[in-house]
Amino acid sequence: MRVAMMTREYPPEVYGGAGVHVTELVAQLRKLCDVDVHCMGAPRDGAYVAHPDPTLRGANAALTMLSADLNMVNNAEAATVVHSHTWYTGLAGHLASLLYGVPHVLTAHSLEPLRPWKAEQLGGGYQVSSWVERTAVEAADAVIAVSSGMRDDVLRTYPALDPDRVHVVRNGIDTTVWYPAEPGPDESVLAELGVDLNRPIVAFVGRITRQKGVAHLVAAAHRFAPDVQLVLCAGAPDTPQIAEEVSSAVQQLAQARTGVFWVREMLPTHKIREILSAATVFVCPSVYEPLGIVNLEAMACATAVVASDVGGIPEVVADGRTGLLVHYDANDTEAYEARLAEAVNSLVADPDRAREYGVAGRERCIEEFSWAHIAEQTLEIYRKVSA
């Protein structure tokens, strides 16, 4: 078996959960079968890199992406199975399946119709990305959803799909990379920021998008207990508009309270690990989240999690055992922000409970979310569609 793994992101250019998923999955699958990685971006060793057509420079981002997909198909002739991730490579997987007569497996890390704010980023290209996703999903031999909640969303959004073709394979976590870590003596990111380790720390790690709910967290932070510090590792804004909105909100928060730290660049793993490990609470305020690898990263670092109850998050964060779930209501976001603050303050006021949640979270990661198991599940789907 030879798998063509199609992805927009691959090391060293990984900025989201789908990229993390592909990176870890490939490492484990290569112990079980042959895998060729087909990705986008800068040239790199160990992968076929597909580039957009240079004559489309300046065109809508969705169109340039599709031209890269065509180049990706051209390099996948040797595959016996193609496996695409997200709409960015869905068309490549679909066309490779048609052109070479091989099965197409598609992992749905999110669904375009459930992310209408993407129209801010893509303009009319949002209609293109939605069409690509529908075409690829409905034609795929198998669709992998990263949570049971995501599987329900897939079947609701694309009712033409045969439910037997939709499988659940959750995201995982490498607990040898994500673990409780003390600040380094010489290169402590917390020391560089000026964070007081003797005061409670609330942390957020993620991109600045509507989906991730950063603005809701910043609004909630006005209600945090006075001694709480907020460390925001938030960058890569989707649009100038949301970048300005979040920047203005953080500035207002910093004027209203002390201990607000904003890291705008994407930090390396060891620095994120340090921040997560030092945090009293990690907050995931997402308004849409098929699973949320970042919650697993925080839990693996033995940190209690406060998260919204959307999508697949309840399949990761065990409410009252590894953290607290907060109900999200799109029609009453002010109440949601108040509930976020209440949950955070309850754990800050009870550090023993926060520590217990953290320990239980790491145990849950080790027992239930190994990448080796995820690779075995994925390989079984390859075998099924190839039979």
From Swiss-Prot:
UniProt-recorded name of the protein: Alpha-maltose-1-phosphate synthase
Family under the similarity heading: Belongs to the glycosyltransferase group 1 family.
Enzyme class: transferase
PANTHER family found in the cross-reference section: ALPHA-MALTOSE-1-PHOSPHATE SYNTHASE, GLYCOSYLTRANSFERASE
Pathway: Glycan biosynthesis; glycogen biosynthesis
Name of a matching Pfam family: Glyco_transf_4
SUPFAM superfamilies referenced in this protein's UniProt entry, alphabetically: UDP-Glycosyltransferase/glycogen phosphorylase
BP-aspect Gene Ontology terms: glycogen biosynthetic process
InterPro entries: Glyco_trans_1, Glyco_trans_4-like_N, M1P_synthase
Function per UniProt: Involved in the biosynthesis of the maltose-1-phosphate (M1P) building block required for alpha-glucan production by the key enzyme GlgE. Catalyzes the formation of an alpha-1,4 linkage between glucose from ADP-glucose and glucose 1-phosphate (G1P) to yield maltose-1-phosphate (M1P).
UniProt entry tagged with the keyword Transferase: yes
EC number: 2.4.1.342
Keywords: Carbohydrate metabolism, Glycosyltransferase, Transferase
Molecular-function GO term, any one: glycosyltransferase activity
Note: Maltose-1-phosphate (M1P) is generated by two alternative routes: the TreS-Pep2 branch and the GlgC-GlgM branch, however it seems that the GlgC-GlgM branch provides most of M1P for the GlgE pathway in M.smegmatis.
Mutant lacking the gene: phenotype: Cells lacking this gene do not show a discernible effect on alpha-glucan content and do not accumulate ADP-glucose. Combined inactivation of both glgM and glgB completely blocks alpha-glucan production. Combined inactivation of both glgM and ostA accumulates ADP-glucose. In the double mutant treS-glgE, inactivation of the glgM gene fully abolishes maltose 1-phosphate (M1P) production.
Catalytic activity annotation: ADP-alpha-D-glucose + alpha-D-glucose 1-phosphate = alpha-maltose 1-phosphate + ADP + H(+)
